[in-house]
Amino acid sequence: GMASKAGTIVGKIAKVALNAL
């Protein structure tokens, strides 16, 4: 559902942010 999609998006952003560090 939308909740799972939102969670996936947040996870992707978090991974990108950590990689940027």
UniProtKB/Swiss-Prot annotation:
Tissue: Expressed by the skin glands.
Name listed for the protein in its UniProt record: Peptide PGLa-R3
Keywords assigned: Amidation, Amphibian defense peptide, Antimicrobial, Secreted
Organism lineage string: Eukaryota, Metazoa, Chordata, Craniata, Vertebrata
Keyword Ubl conjugation: no
GO cellular component: extracellular region
Lineage top rank: taxon: Eukaryota
Protein family according to the UniProt entry: Belongs to the gastrin/cholecystokinin family. Magainin subfamily.
Functional description taken from the UniProt entry: Antimicrobial peptide.
Localization per record: Secreted
Residues with Leucine amide modification: 21
Record flagged with keyword Secreted: yes
BP-aspect Gene Ontology terms: defense response
